[in-house]
Every structure is written in C-alpha cells, then in structure tokens.
C-alpha cells in the first residue's frame, strides 16, 4: 500500500504536522463528511481482518477510538459485530457519522476526548484504535526521543484504555510505528496487559499490536518500557522530521 489512507485522496492538510493534534483542524477537515467517501488510515478492514477477527466475539462490546470518518465501525457491524461505540473529539465528524449511519441505530457515535473517556471502568471487551496515537504524536520531531509531553499524552490514552477494558479484554492498536519505537509505550506493567505484535498490508507493512488485559509482559518488553523516559542512543544521528506536504509522512513517522 503506497499511502496511509484508503477510499479517497487526502483532503487539505494542516500547516504543520502538529496540527493533527488540534480539534480545530479536524472540525474543518470534516465539514461535509456525511456526504464524502470514508477515509481510512493504515488500510481498510479487509487488509487486517484476518488478524482482527480471531480476537472478536459477536457479543463483544467494542469501542473505537478516534473514529474520524473511517468505515471501520460500519464494517465491523456488517462483519457480525453489532455492539460498536465510536468516539472522536471532533463534534463535526461525530454528527456526520450519525447522519451517515442513521439507518443503523445499533451503532453509537459520541464526541469524546480519548485522554479522558466518559465511560465506567470495565465497560468494554475490546478497544480499537487505528492512527489515533499517531496523530497525537505527529508533532514530535525525533522518533528516538519522544518529548515528555508526548509520553504523557500516550500514557493518558493507554491508562484510559486499560481502565475501560474488562478483565480478559483486548486492546488492538494499528499504526505505522515499528516495535522498537512503539513497544516502549505499550510495555508498562501498570496497564496490566500482555503484548503481541504482527504486521499486515502488501508492499508497505503496517503494524498491529494486541494487548490482553490480565496478561503479563515479558522481561524483554519490560526492559523496553523502562526506556520510555531514557531512550537508547539512536544508531545514527537523530532524524528531525520536516513537515510534509502530503499524508504519507504518517507512514514514516514511526513514533
């Protein structure tokens, strides 16, 4: 896959990559989203379905973080997983998705900040995110040394994911970030989960991380997690990313 999106050409981009973290950008981007084609980061459902479906049961309560105008929630419904709640902090896109899928009342759409979820603890069996963490980290300049702000932001999200998952629940994260960059974020013992990694896609490979609530991290994973505030020296001089004029940069940002 040549680009991170599927379904249509990328819309207008923010002036700087850090704009991907701002709700104002997304509100503007999603004007008219109810009538536009879906846009999926890092592949559509068919590209990772074989990895995802073994982790899902028809009765699962599924939460999709940062849904945007992706087709994922609707495709889960069509695939036999009807209990899907999707959240995004852009009220514009939430309203658009409610309008687009008004014929499917089982699907729920809510405006919410993924760093502070308004759900009771242990209320979901599965939490999915695809590209949401990547967007929150898009302003980082050096993939080897994530800022303390970036580390804290990701920790806020992951802590909330762990909180809303039931014992035995699954968190599935799809991203462009390779294990040597992303594992250290997920591999914190206090989240209370195990961690596995797989790749998907043809040509350019994306990464799928599977966490089981109640499992344990390996010694090697815990060692990586311990590096989050004191990362190892990179093998070459740090690459300071320049703002890109297209959204392929998210496939290379590797945070």
Curated annotation (Swiss-Prot):
It catalyses: L-lysyl-[protein] + S-adenosyl-L-methionine = N(6)-methyl-L-lysyl-[protein] + S-adenosyl-L-homocysteine + H(+); N(6)-methyl-L-lysyl-[protein] + S-adenosyl-L-methionine = N(6),N(6)-dimethyl-L-lysyl-[protein] + S-adenosyl-L-homocysteine + H(+); N(6),N(6)-dimethyl-L-lysyl-[protein] + S-adenosyl-L-methionine = N(6),N(6),N(6)-trimethyl-L-lysyl-[protein] + S-adenosyl-L-homocysteine + H(+). Protein-lysine methyltransferase that efficiently catalyzes three successive methylations on 'Lys-36' in eukaryotic translation elongation factor 1 alpha (EEF1A1 or EEF1A2). S-adenosyl-L-methionine binds at residues 26, 30, 41, 66, 88-89, 113-114, 130. The keyword Metal-binding does not apply. Pfam families: Methyltransf_11 (PF08241). Belongs to the methyltransferase superfamily. The modification Phosphotyrosine is found at residue 39. The gene is EEF1AKMT4. Its EC number is 2.1.1.-. InterPro entries: Lys/N-term_MeTrsfase_sf, Methyltransf_11, SAM-dependent_MTases_sf. This is EEF1A lysine methyltransferase 4. Coiled coil: none annotated. Changing residue 134 to A: Abolishes protein-lysine N-methyltransferase activity. Changing residue 133 to A: Reduces protein-lysine N-methyltransferase activity. GO terms for biological process: methylation. Keywords: Methyltransferase, Phosphoprotein, S-adenosyl-L-methionine, Transferase. It is an enzyme of class 2 (transferase). The keyword Protein biosynthesis does not apply. Changing residue 129 to A: Abolishes protein-lysine N-methyltransferase activity. A motif (Required for methyltransferase activity) lies at residues 129-134. GO terms for molecular function: methyltransferase activity; protein-lysine N-methyltransferase activity.
